[in-house]
Every structure is written in C-alpha cells, then in structure tokens.
C-alpha cells in the first residue's frame, strides 16, 4: 500500500494563498457595497457637484445683490413682451404705464415661482447657471421671492386697482396647483388615482392650475376679460408637456440642469411619469418615486423612455400644438427630445 505524504506549504505559497483570499474577500465586499449603494438613494451631500456649486461669497459668482436680480439676468427683463404684443399690439403706445406694469407683474410672478421651485426641487442649475439658492442660500432666496411678490401686489393694488382682482385670483390658483403637486410628492401615490384616464385627468387639472393660471393671468391683465382663456390654457398645457418631456428625453436639458430625470429623482409627477405608471413594467416607476435609488431610477427610465410611452407623449404634444403654432413660435423653446430607452 502506498502512503501519501503531505508536505507543508512553503512560506511563499502561504503568502500567495493569503493574498488570494484577501483579494477575493475585497472583491466580494466591493460587489456587496455596489449593490447596496445602487439600491438605495444617496444623500445629496455626498454629491461632488452639490459640494462645488455653493459659494460662501455671492460676489465671487455674480455681482448682483439679490436672487431676483440674478434670475432676471438669466431670463432677461420682460421676457413675456412678445405675448403682450400679440394680445394687444398697440398697448405699448396706448397705455405705456399699464404695458410696463403688466410686464413687471409677469416677470415677478413667473421668476419668483421659479426661485421657490428650484429650492423645492433641490435643483443645482437653472439654464446652465447655478440656481439662485445655491449662491444666496435657500432662506434668502425664498424670502426675496416672497418680498418681490408682495411688492408687486402692493404696486398693482395702489397703481392699477382694476388689475388687482385678476392678479390675486390667478396667483391663488397657481399656488393651489403647486400645493397639489407638492402634496403628491409628500404622500406618494396613495392619494393619486389608480385608473390610467383618471391619473392623466388629475395631472392635467394640476397643470391647468399651476401653469395654466400663469398664462391665463397674462390674458386677464392685458385684456381684462376671459376671451383668451382657452387659447392660453392650451399654450400652457403644451409648455407643461414640453417641460415634462425634456426632463426625461432631452440631452441638452440634462446638461443644462446637471441632472437626468430630476423629476423622477425628486419623487415629482410629470406627464411621461404618469403615463409610464400604467405601461408594462410600470411598477419600476412606482418604486423609483417611493425610493429613488440608482437601480430603481434606471429601470424606471427604461419604462419612461420606451417607445410606447415616448410615442404617447409626442402624440399629445402634437395634438395640443396643432392650433397654436403662432403662439409657440413666440415661446421659442425647441429642445431636442432625443433620449430613448436605456
């Protein structure tokens, strides 16, 4: 009978075996960490982008002393002027004081809403520039927005009292729509309809309040009647659709915002997101809204950017824009919606 002899491993072999064991263990740990990180939302303070944008000294980023002046510089003064000219071509000459007041009101309401929106959304950029609250801080930015809106309300009441009721009513509707959107974000989907048609209708009603009221306000201020409500509502709905779609479909928009699918990561509903909930694999969208981990967001984006959802969004944009092309030419926003399934 042959006896098997075993010899102890040499020192080099033992070292190699130990190194191999450590390497395998380290790789396993990396895989576990990656899977864990990929499945859970990362704290915003871990983002290098989040750390770099904020400035302790606003003067190092802009010479403008307040958030409102800063965002107004980005968009330009009186950016609603083309719409006013279309609604009333001679207002600038017939009543220059009212003409200027209408433009001041529209700038103040629109831009101040964006200041607060960017805080709510945690946005880092606005049109490729640092968002105002990332320069001046959330508290000063929000307070300046409230201050400017209060100033414009007082100026309207004292100087143009016949315009004040229109402004107050439409501003209330805008904020009601914004509040509804924020409640959905806070509560998740438990208070949102489940049937596809009901979901789309609920979202469109919110958009009509939040965005539609802003556009209708312009018609109310210029014409002092409701004769353009239907047209302004349609222009507003297209604007909302365009904004929603570019958030998930536009490479250009993602570069300017410094984020892809910001609405989804923030747990905020948009038209493509609402449609995707009822698409095949729509449960990924629900999961991403509840827990926006990289894994959930990637899978949700795959559904949102699917051919079916993309085609439904493009069809709605085409239908809503068919009768308002002259108004959309004034709006002038044409981001290329080129992102597809991932």
UniProtKB/Swiss-Prot annotation:
Function, as annotated, reads: Prenyl transferase; part of the gene cluster that mediates the biosynthesis of the indole diterpenes penitrems. The geranylgeranyl diphosphate (GGPP) synthase ptmG catalyzes the first step in penitrem biosynthesis via conversion of farnesyl pyrophosphate and isopentyl pyrophosphate into geranylgeranyl pyrophosphate (GGPP). Condensation of indole-3-glycerol phosphate with GGPP by the prenyl transferase ptmC then forms 3-geranylgeranylindole (3-GGI).
Q: Name one GO molecular function term.
A: prenyltransferase activity
Q: Name one GO biological process term.
A: isoprenoid biosynthetic process
Q: What is this protein called?
A: Prenyl transferase ptmC
- Please give the organism: Penicillium ochrochloron
Q: Which residues are glycosylated?
A: 154
Question: What is the enzyme's class at the highest EC level?
Answer: transferase
Please provide, in alphabetical order, the Gene Ontology terms of the cellular component aspect for this entry.
membrane
The positions annotated for binding Mg(2+) 1 are 117, 121
What lineage, starting at the top, does this entry show?
Eukaryota, Fungi, Dikarya, Ascomycota, Pezizomycotina
Annotated metabolic or biological route of this protein? Secondary metabolite biosynthesis
Per UniProt, subcellular location reads as: Membrane
Query: Could you tell me the keywords of this UniProt record?
Result: Glycoprotein, Magnesium, Membrane, Metal-binding, Transferase, Transmembrane, Transmembrane helix
């Amino acid at each position: 009978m042959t006896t098997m002899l075993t010899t102890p491993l040499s020192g080099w072999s033992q070292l190699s075996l130990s190194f191999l064991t450590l390497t395998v263990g380290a790789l396993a740990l990396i895989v576990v960490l990656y899977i864990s990180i990929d499945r859970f939302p990362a704290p915003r303070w871990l983002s290098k982008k989040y750390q770099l944008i904020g400035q302790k000294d606003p003067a190092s980023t802009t010479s403008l002393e307040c958030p409102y002046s800063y965002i107004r510089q980005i968009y330009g003064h009186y950016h609603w002027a083309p719409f006013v000219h279309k609604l009333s071509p001679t207002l600038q000459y017939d009543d220059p004081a009212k003409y200027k007041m209408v433009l001041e009101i529209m700038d103040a309401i629109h831009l101040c809403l964006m200041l607060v929106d960017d805080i709510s959304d945690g946005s880092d950029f606005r049109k490729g520039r640092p968002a105002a609250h990332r320069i001046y801080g959330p508290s000063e930015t929000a307070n300046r927005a409230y201050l400017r809106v209060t100033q414009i309300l007082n100026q309207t009441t004292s100087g143009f009292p016949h315009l004040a009721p229109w402004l107050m009513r439409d501003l209330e509707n805008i904020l009601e729509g914004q509040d509804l959107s924020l409640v959905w974000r806070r509560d998740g989907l438990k208070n949102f309809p489940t049937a596809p048609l009901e979901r789309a209708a609920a979202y469109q009603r919110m958009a009509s309040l939040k965005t539609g009221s802003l556009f209708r306000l312009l018609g109310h201020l210029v014409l002092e009647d409701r004769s353009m409500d239907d047209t302004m509502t349609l222009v507003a709905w297209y604007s909302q659709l365009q904004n929603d779609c570019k958030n998930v479909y536009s490479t250009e928009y993602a570069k300017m915002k410094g984020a892809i699918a910001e609405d989804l990561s923030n747990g905020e509903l948009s038209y493509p997101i609402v449609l995707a909930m009822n698409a095949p694999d729509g449960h990924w969208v629900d999961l991403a809204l509840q827990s926006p981990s990289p894994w959930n967001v990637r899978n949700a984006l795959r559904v949102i950017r699917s051919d079916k959802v993309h085609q439904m969004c493009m069809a709605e944009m085409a239908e809503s824009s068919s009768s308002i092309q002259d108004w959309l030419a004034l709006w002038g926003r044409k981001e290329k919606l080129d992102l597809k399934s991932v």
